[in-house]
C-alpha cells in the first residue's frame, strides 16, 4: 500500500478525465508543480468536487501513482469564491494561475511562488489596487523567481518607474502590494515588464484573450 503524503499548495488547473474523474495541476510548496488525479471528483456529492476547483488552496493528501499522484483528501484553507463573482477579476485571477502553471517546475520547492499566488489573488480582490498593477507586479516577481529579470527596466524609464521596479524585486512578499502608481508610470512599468515576459515566456494565455474581448 502506498504511503500518503501531504502537500500544501493551490489548484492551478482542473480538467475532466474520463466520466467522473479530474486531472489537476497543483502548485505545491514542497514539490513545485505536480499532476494529481482525483478519482470520482465529478460525481454528485463527492467530497472532492469543490476541493478540486481552480483557486483552491489547502493541504492535499496524496499517494504516488504511475503518472503523478492520486488524491485521497483535501483540507481546504481558501476557495477564493469571490473571484468568480466578477468577470474581470476572474480573468485576471485565471491569468495568475495560467502564468504560474507555465513557469512552475516539477521537483523544486516553490513556497515563495505559492505565497505569491495567494497574495496576488488577495490583491485582485482589493478594490483600491488596479488589476493591471497587480498583474504587472506579479509578472515581474515571477520573473525574479525564475531568474529571468533585469535589475532596472530594459527600456529607458522615469525615476518613479525605476524605483517601483527595484521595490518589486526587493520587497518582502507581505509588502509587495502596498503602493500604487500614476497612470503614466503604470503604463511605463507595464511596457517594460511585458517586454521581459515575452522574451522569457512567449506563451499564449487564454484568459488574456477573454480579457481583451470584454
Put a short name on every predicted segment:
Residues 1-22, 27-214:
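Non-catalytic alpha-helical scaffolds and adjoining flexible linkers that form interface surfaces
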Amino acid at each position: 500500500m502506498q504511503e500518503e503524503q501531504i502537500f500544501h499548495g493551490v489548484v492551478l488547473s482542473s480538467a475532466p478525465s474520463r466520466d467522473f474523474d479530474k486531472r489537476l495541476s497543483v502548485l505545491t510548496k514542497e514539490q513545485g508543480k505536480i499532476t494529481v488525479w482525483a478519482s470520482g471528483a465529478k460525481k454528485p456529492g463527492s467530497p472532492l468536487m469543490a476541493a478540486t476547483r481552480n483557486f483552491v488552496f489547502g493541504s492535499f493528501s496524496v499517494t504516488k501513482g504511475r503518472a503523478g499522484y492520486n488524491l485521497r483528501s483535501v483540507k481546504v484553507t481558501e476557495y477564493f469564491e469571490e473571484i468568480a463573482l466578477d468577470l474581470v477579476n476572474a480573468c485576471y485571477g485565471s491569468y495568475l494561475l495560467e502564468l504560474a502553471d507555465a513557469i512552475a517546475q516539477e521537483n523544486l520547492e516553490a513556497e515563495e511562488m505559492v505565497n505569491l499566488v495567494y497574495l496576488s489573488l488577495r490583491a485582485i480582490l482589493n478594490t483600491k489596487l488596479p488589476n493591471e498593477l497587480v498583474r504587472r507586479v506579479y509578472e515581474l516577481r515571477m520573473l525574479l523567481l525564475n531568474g529571468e529579470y533585469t535589475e532596472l527596466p530594459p527600456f529607458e524609464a522615469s525615476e518613479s518607474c525605476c524605483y517601483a521596479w527595484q521595490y518589486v524585486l526587493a520587497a518582502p512578499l507581505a509588502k509587495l502590494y502596498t503602493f500604487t502608481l500614476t497612470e503614466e508610470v503604470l503604463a511605463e512599468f507595464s511596457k517594460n515588464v511585458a517586454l521581459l515576459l515575452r522574451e522569457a515566456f512567449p506563451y499564449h494565455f487564454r484568459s488574456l484573450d477573454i480579457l481583451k474581448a470584454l
